[in-house]
């Protein structure tokens, strides 16, 4: 069986079993004002800042509101409050004003001087796929099984008493893979959360950031930009896994594959955030290629993977004359600029925990390893955990390594020493020991395992059966 991973795209197993899945679109046809769901960001005035917003400082709270978070109801999490903040941030550079929304969840047992930045994977260019929308009670994606698994992991963080902030780190255009937008929006979400007076958080609160896969784009770039963009923040650690650190390498790695929709979405995100890229790509792309880009702007991840399989970015169906536009002099320098580790001045200044499966079939291991080496040469303090077992793929690494991510958060919050310099560790697979985290979290991990079955791996039939019995495309 072809290896299939990534929590959000396990639906590919069902595709192989049934031959096809009909796409249930998450696109514009859902954006009706009379919808029973919470209003789409397209129609929700909360997402639009008032005049003069661009004259404020990054991290300024422009608007706030209370919300109900759907998964906290199903997981029976006792929250003290759930808020959304519209805040000022920056775009592709710090001279380009932008804005975004972050969702703040405060558990009853919250500690006043601790904050966890959770960077969710979105991997789409459609605003209705942003965390701030799909988290809301009654949102179309709120009960999607794929969404549920990631939220089970967030539950672990909340159960530990950490206030969390979950930004729409792709910005108002949902510009997937536009690295600096991801990083700026993540750092400014921290600022906005600390600035939100109702929370009464200590401005010097210890902060740990965590992100996997598409969320690791945000995490890696937030770590890179912290030392130059948000020096006042007391970030004490970054956890990033399955990291797409090299945009170009990821595009090539996924090109023409079952997961090529991610490449198309990445191209769309860069096209939408860099006018010069938009102009050039617009001149060489075919109508079918343009339709593929537009598809990613109107659908969420599940539909993108199903609808855009085996797309070749340099093929005749996507680009005129089968031109490799990624190497063009008008685009290649920008893609290089968006690669983690190419600028030594952007080396992370606080501890970094990276983890990656050697046989990751979605995000290339070698590229993440290269970034780790570059950061270490720049003086980073970094632990790189490699999993070499053949059973370890993209999804199994995220799920099974969760206890060690949470242990990293705990250690950083408690002020434990981190290694001085860099270390590479290699194991077949994570040591599955929920007891590391305390008995009260066992139920959370059992919920994750029960969803997938007792084993999680590249040939797991139990996962396949779970997918077949659920609708893994968005509604």
UniProtKB/Swiss-Prot annotation:
Question: What would be an example GO MF term here?
Answer: triacylglycerol lipase activity
Record protein name field:
Secreted triacylglycerol lipase LIP5
**What EC number(s) would the UniProt record show?**
3.1.1.-, 3.1.1.3
Gene it is expressed from: LIP5
Q: What are the alphabetically sorted keywords of the record?
A: Disulfide bond, Glycoprotein, Hydrolase, Lipid degradation, Lipid metabolism, Signal, Virulence
What's one Pfam family the UniProt record gives for this protein?
Answer: LIP
- Glycosylation-annotated residues: 246, 312, 369, 471
Return the similarity comment.
Answer: Belongs to the AB hydrolase superfamily. Lipase family. Class Lip subfamily.
Q: Where is the signal peptide?
A: 1-19
Keyword Nucleotidyltransferase: yes or no?
no
Q: List the disulfide bonds.
A: 129-300
Source organism per UniProt: Malassezia globosa (strain ATCC MYA-4612 / CBS 7966)
Record-linked InterPro entries? AB_hydrolase_fold, Lipase_secreted
């Amino acid at each position: 069986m072809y290896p299939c991973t990534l929590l959000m795209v396990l639906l590919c197993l069902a595709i192989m079993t049934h031959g096809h899945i009909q796409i249930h679109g998450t696109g514009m046809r859902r954006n009706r004002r009379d919808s029973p769901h919470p209003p789409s960001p397209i129609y929700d005035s909360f997402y639009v800042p008032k005049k003069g917003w661009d004259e404020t400082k990054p991290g300024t709270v422009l608007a706030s509101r209370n919300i109900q978070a759907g998964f906290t109801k199903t997981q029976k999490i006792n929250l003290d409050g759930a808020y959304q903040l519209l805040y000022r941030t920056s775009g592709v550079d710090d001279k380009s004003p932008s804005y975004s929304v972050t969702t703040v969840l405060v558990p009853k047992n919250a500690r006043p001087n601790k904050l966890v930045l959770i960077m969710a994977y979105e991997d789409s260019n459609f605003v209705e796929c942003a965390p701030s929308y799909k988290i809301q009670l009654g949102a179309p994606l709120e009960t999607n099984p794929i969404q549920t698994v990631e939220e089970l992991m967030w539950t672990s963080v909340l159960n530990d008493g950490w206030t969390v902030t979950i930004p729409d780190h792709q910005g108002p255009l949902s510009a997937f893979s536009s690295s600096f937008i991801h990083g700026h929006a993540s750092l400014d979400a921290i600022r906005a959360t600390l600035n939100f007076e109702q929370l009464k958080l200590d401005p010097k609160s210890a902060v740990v950031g965590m992100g996997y896969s598409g969320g690791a784009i945000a995490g890696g770039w937030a770590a890179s930009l912290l030392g130059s963009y948000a020096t006042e923040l007391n970030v004490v650690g970054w956890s990033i896994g399955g990291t797409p650190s090299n945009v170009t390498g990821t595009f090539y790695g996924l090109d023409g594959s079952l997961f090529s929709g991610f490449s198309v979405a990445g191209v769309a995100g860069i096209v939408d955030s860099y006018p010069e890229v938009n102009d050039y790509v617009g001149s060489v792309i075919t109508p079918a290629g343009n339709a593929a880009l537009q598809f990613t702007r109107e659908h969420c991840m599940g539909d993108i993977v199903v609808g855009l399989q085996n797309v070749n970015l340099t093929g005749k169906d996507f680009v005129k004359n089968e031109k490799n536009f990624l190497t063009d002099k008008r685009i290649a320098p920008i893609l290089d600029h968006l690669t983690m580790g190419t600028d030594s001045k952007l080396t992370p200044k606080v501890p970094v925990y990276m983890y990656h499966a050697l046989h990751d079939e979605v995000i290339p291991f070698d590229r993440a390893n290269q970034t780790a080496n570059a950061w270490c040469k720049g003086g980073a303090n970094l632990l790189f955990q490699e999993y070499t077992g053949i059973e370890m793929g993209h999804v199994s690494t995220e799920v099974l390594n969760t206890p060690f991510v949470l242990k990293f958060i705990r250690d950083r919050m408690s002020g434990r020493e981190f290694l001085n310099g860099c270390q590479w560790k290699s194991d077949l697979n994570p040591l599955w020991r929920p007891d590391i985290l305390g008995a009260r979290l066992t139920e959370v991990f059992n919920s994750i395992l029960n969803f997938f079955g007792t084993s999680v791996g590249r040939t797991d039939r139990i996962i396949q059966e779970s997918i077949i019995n659920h609708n893994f495309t968005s509604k």
